């Protein structure tokens, strides 16, 4: 695995890696909706969205999504790095695991609904950053 991955960790016995991936997808879902809302706010209040991304990229809001996908959202570049339809699948798995653990994550459920709406509009093969089209 070290041949194709920079960050390799054993998180426990079989199945724990899957749960770790779900944690990643849950956090990413929150980052994506926050990024979309932040960029919408920037735009509606007259800020330059690209300058705003550059400004906050070194602060507490910094994330891989902000740095890599924020500019693509602003430029309306929805070429896939990770397909919407695949992200929906992961979010569905995460929600199923939440249900099995008696855990309610309303933000996760809401973000999944936005992505499902995007897919219903023909965006299933777009990149996850195309979420900006839904709001």
Predicted regions located by residue number:
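Helical "substrate-binding/catalytic lid" subdomain
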Residues: 16-135
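Acidic-glycine-rich active-site phosphate/pyrophosphate-binding loop
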Residues: 1-14, 64-70
């Amino acid at each position: 695995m070290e041949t194709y991955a920079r960050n390799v960790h054993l998180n426990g016995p079989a199945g724990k890696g899957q749960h770790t991936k779900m944690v990643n997808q849950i956090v990413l879902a929150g980052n994506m909706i926050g990024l979309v809302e932040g960029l919408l706010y920037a735009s509606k209040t007259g800020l330059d969205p690209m300058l705003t991304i550059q400004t906050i990229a070194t602060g507490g809001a910094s994330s891989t999504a902000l740095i890599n996908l924020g500019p693509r959202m602003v430029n309306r570049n929805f070429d896939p790095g990770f397909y919407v339809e695949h992200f929906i699948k992961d979010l569905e798995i995460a929600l199923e695991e939440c249900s099995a653990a008696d855990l309610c994550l309303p933000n996760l459920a809401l973000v999944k609904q936005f992505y499902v709406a995007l897919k219903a509009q023909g965006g299933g093969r777009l990149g996850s950053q195309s979420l900006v089209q839904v709001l």
